[in-house]
């Protein structure tokens, strides 16, 4: 019956959503555990070892921040690409993404005249093809995932970046500037009593980015002509596997 078909469609959508949620969760669990183990090691370390471990947890926190954002973004696009739907069934940004990498190659003069003509024709055709692949260079953390870079990644994913802008001081100064100083062998003094808040904050930002993508999938805000949902997606609540923070 029509009712049963509708119920099956809803269940199918939940299964697809939860499968992506489970992937996100798996990649988060081991990162959270490593940070938790490092915090425990710092608290029980002897005085000479503590400064080394404090510097290490800054580098580790940044590494997990960068790695998790990149993983979530790539898995999100893989999730959409597996549908092999026409570009016209997705929000405009999906089609824009398909052109961006090719435009970069065009700008750098690495393509033939034939390929340049093809790029222009593809743009003029308005997305007649299917979305089945994302240029991996687009989700580029630049080994320097500061506020401006995460905003670019949010643009590629077509999600709101305001929350990260509001945390610019934490990302760019308390995390990234310190990480860069440590990576270049400079002295950087970290206080033991700030580690709990720092780790909780980075896990919160990782979880926030994950939720932005999960909510888009659950509400199908990635679909064409779904602008109302996209305006509400930031307030949507994920129905599966809520993130627990340390």
Residue positions per predicted region:
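A broad, structural surface signal
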Residues: 62-70, 74, 200, 204-207, ...
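Polyanionic, low-complexity intrinsically disordered segments
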Residues: 6-40, 148-246
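Alpha-helical scaffold segments that form or flank carboxylate-/histidine-based iron centers
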Residues: 50-63, 90
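A long, hydrophobic alpha-helical segment
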Residues: 36-55
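Helix-centric, low-specificity signal for extended rod-like, repetitive segments
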Residues: 24-25, 48, 63, 109, ...
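Helix-loop junctions and short alpha-helical segments
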Residues: 60-61, 68, 72-164
């Amino acid at each position: 019956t029509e009712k049963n078909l509708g119920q099956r469609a809803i269940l199918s959508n939940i299964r697809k959503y939860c499968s992506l949620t489970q992937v996100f969760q798996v990649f988060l669990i081991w990162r959270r555990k490593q940070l938790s183990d490092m915090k425990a090691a710092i608290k029980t370390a002897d005085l000479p070892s503590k400064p080394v471990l404090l510097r290490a947890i800054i580098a580790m926190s940044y590494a997990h921040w960068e790695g998790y954002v990149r993983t979530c973004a790539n898995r999100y696009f893989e999730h959409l690409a597996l549908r092999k739907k026409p570009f016209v069934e997705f929000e405009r940004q999906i089609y824009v993404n398909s052109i961006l990498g090719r435009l970069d190659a065009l700008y750098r003069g690495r393509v033939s005249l034939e390929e340049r003509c093809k790029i222009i024709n593809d743009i003029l055709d308005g997305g007649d093809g299917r979305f089945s692949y994302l240029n991996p260079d687009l989700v580029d953390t630049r080994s320097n995932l500061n506020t401006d870079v995460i905003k670019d990644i949010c643009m590629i994913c077509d999600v709101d970046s305001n929350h990260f802008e509001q945390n610019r001081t934490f990302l760019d100064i308390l995390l990234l500037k310190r990480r860069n100083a440590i990576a270049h062998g400079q002295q950087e003094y970290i206080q033991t009593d700030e580690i709990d808040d720092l780790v909780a904050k980075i896990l919160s930002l990782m979880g926030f980015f994950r939720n932005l993508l999960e909510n888009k999938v659950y509400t199908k805000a990635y679909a064409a002509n779904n602008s109302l949902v996209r305006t509400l997606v930031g307030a949507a609540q994920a129905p599966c596997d809520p993130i627990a923070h340390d």
